[in-house]
Amino acid sequence: MTKPISRIGSRRNVRIGSRKSGRRIPKGVIHVQASFNNTIVTVTDIRGRVVSWSSAGTCGFRGTRRGTPFAAQTAASNAIRTVVDQGMQRAEVRIKGPGLGRDAALRAIRRSGILLSFVRDVTPMPHNGCRPPKKRRV
């Protein structure tokens, strides 16, 4: 005997692709996470709520091309394009990670016309904590 499935959470009351675009954000924080494999750019407001994000993978880069500086530049300009339309004028930049896309993403952010109050490197550095993984032998 099968149980009847309730239709409480039907598709009719689910938002389809509509975002909160009416919010005006004069100041925000741009987080750049640059690893060797990918670069993720997230734009938040001052309280930390995500406004826009993009990565090299979502911009169409696949495989080893995701870690390139050009992919990071494309991801940064995609993430910033939406927040410039919402009225962002000033921003703080926090860069994390050792990847190749650090400088390229910062260059794209500078070119976007947003005034940068400061650029901070927030890469986590261990104070001799966990043992690192063994070195690769290629």
Swiss-Prot record:
Major place of residence: plastid
Assigned protein family: Belongs to the universal ribosomal protein uS11 family.
Name under which the protein is recorded: Small ribosomal subunit protein uS11c
Keyword rRNA-binding among UniProt keywords: yes
Subunit structure: Part of the 30S ribosomal subunit.
GO cellular component annotations of the record: chloroplast; ribonucleoprotein complex; ribosome
HAMAP family attached to this UniProt entry: Ribosomal_uS11
Top-level taxonomic group: Eukaryota
A Pfam entry, by short name: Ribosomal_S11
A GO biological process held by the record: translation
An MF annotation (GO) of this entry: rRNA binding
Organism: Nandina domestica
Entry-linked NCBIfam families: PRK05309.1 (NF003698), uS11_bact (TIGR03632)
